[in-house]
């Protein structure tokens, strides 16, 4: 895990606040990237220059029109009006240029073309979050390993994976030995356990499922991602089992057992979990995981997500998710800025899983993974998981992807 400290976001200042350990680590990373600068041409020819875009990089606290130069698969320069040539040029005038998006909750490895579809939408790193359990994990591992972009997967604690009748309604399916064996066999790809705890998935077994998940990962120093929302057990019982580095996805799920009470207060167990380093993730999804009134109340209470994710599936592209930029767009009319959104889709998720530790930034020397977005004004109907509609005045659209310094064609 990249960090055991949670990112705390101030709803007033709207800036990312990192703790001392993260600051020292970030400073060391900057020094490391600085050592690359001598390897790049200063005014000669680069491999690729993305010219004239509004470059937003929360890791650098950068928001301004810049030219972005790439050489040898890495960021070589970020400058105003760069006086240099390049083998290839992208005209990004009128567009937003950001680090490649990192989606930590997808089901991209359920389909062979899933990684490529994500990549064309600007997602240059993803986690497949529990599409399969130990019995059927080989296909997920193979698709994840073959992805062009950095990708990893979580094994579902239910050994048969996602089931219509509920992954762990039969508690014997939460097989500690089988999941641990899968993790140990595929340590290069499997980076944690997914535990779905909703009442239609685990029933009254939710506490025991989470306890077993921790039994699996704790000796391996790996995280658990919990799928919360409408659990049988109260969060006051479940959340004390969460350790630093674990992830709570579907944080905007409505009652029963939401993270916010009827009086608009975030539950104390939720606040305590964040303080000890648990990450809170959007996990948009298709069914039951996000409702506009809960989003509004939670954000008004000052409890902002650490990370955005889609819970992406091929089927979800025709429903409320569509793509990662669309999910981000839904939060613009809740008082979050474009910079707020980009931070939670780039630098913040880069801290959650070690595979992304050098991503989520456009610092010189970093891998040249870039998403180009277009922010279009207009009237857009955004749908939650309950078919409620909110009309927004702006939407982000994917307009280009660069992975390792190479252009990726749009799907």
Write out the residue ranges for each language-model feature.
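Divalent-metal coordination cores built from histidine and acidic residues
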Residues: 116-198
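N-terminal export leaders
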Residues: 19-34
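His/Asp/Glu-enriched, well-ordered alpha-helical/loop segment
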Residues: 293-377
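Histidine-rich, glycine-flanked metal-binding segment
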Residues: 32, 38-49, 55-99
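Active-site core of metal-dependent hydrolases
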Residues: 129, 195-298, 302-318
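C-terminal cap of metal-dependent C-N hydrolases
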Residues: 53, 367-411
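Di-metal (Zn2+ and/or Mg2+/Mn2+) metal-binding site signature of metallo-dependent hydrolases
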Residues: 95-117
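N-terminal secretory signal peptides
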Residues: 1-19
């Amino acid at each position: 895990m990249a960090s055991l400290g949670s990112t705390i976001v101030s709803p007033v200042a709207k800036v990312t606040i990192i703790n001392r350990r993260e600051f020292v680590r970030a400073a060391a990373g900057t020094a490391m990237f600085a050592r690359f600068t001598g390897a790049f041409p200063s005014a000669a020819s680069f491999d690729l220059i993305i010219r004239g875009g509004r470059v937003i990089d929360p890791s650098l606290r950068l928001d301004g029109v810049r030219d972005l130069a790439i050489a040898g698969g890495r960021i070589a320069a970020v400058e105003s009006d760069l006086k240099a040539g390049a083998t290839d040029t992208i005209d990004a005038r009128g567009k937003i240029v950001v680090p490649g998006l990192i989606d930590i909750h997808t089901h991209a490895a359920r389909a062979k073309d899933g990684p490529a579809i994500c990549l064309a939408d600007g997602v240059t790193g993803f986690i497949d979050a529990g599409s399969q359990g130990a019995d059927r994990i080989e296909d997920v591992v193979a698709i994840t390993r073959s992805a062009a972009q950095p990708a990893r997967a979580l094994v579902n604690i239910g050994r048969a994976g996602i089931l219509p009748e509920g992954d762990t309604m039969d508690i014997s399916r939460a097989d500690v030995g089988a999941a641990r064996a899968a993790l140990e066999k595929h340590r290069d790809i499997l980076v944690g356990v997914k535990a779905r705890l909703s009442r239609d998935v685990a029933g009254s077994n939710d506490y025991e499922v989470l306890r077993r998940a921790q039994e699996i990962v704790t000796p391996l120093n790996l995280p658990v991602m919990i799928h919360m929302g409408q659990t049988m057990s109260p969060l006051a019982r479940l959340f004390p089992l969460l350790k630093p580095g674990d992830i709570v996805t579907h944080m905007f799920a409505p009652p029963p057992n939401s993270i916010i009470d009827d009086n608009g207060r975030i539950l104390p167990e939720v606040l305590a979990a964040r303080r000890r380093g648990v990450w809170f993730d959007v996990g948009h999804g298709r069914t039951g995981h996000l409702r506009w009134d809960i989003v509004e109340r939670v954000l008004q209470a000052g409890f902002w997500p650490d990370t955005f994710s889609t819970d992406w599936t091929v089927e979800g592209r025709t429903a409320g998710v569509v793509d990662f930029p669309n999910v981000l767009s839904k939060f613009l009319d809740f008082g979050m800025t474009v910079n707020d959104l980009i931070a939670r889709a780039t630098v913040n998720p880069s801290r959650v899983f070690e595979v992304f530790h050098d991503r989520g930034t456009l610092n010189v020397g970093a891998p040249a993974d870039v998403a180009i977005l277009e922010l279009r004004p207009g009237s857009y109907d955004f749908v939650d998981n309950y078919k409620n509609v909110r009309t927004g005045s702006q939407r982000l659209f994917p307009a280009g992807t660069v992975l390792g310094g190479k252009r990726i064609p749009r799907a």
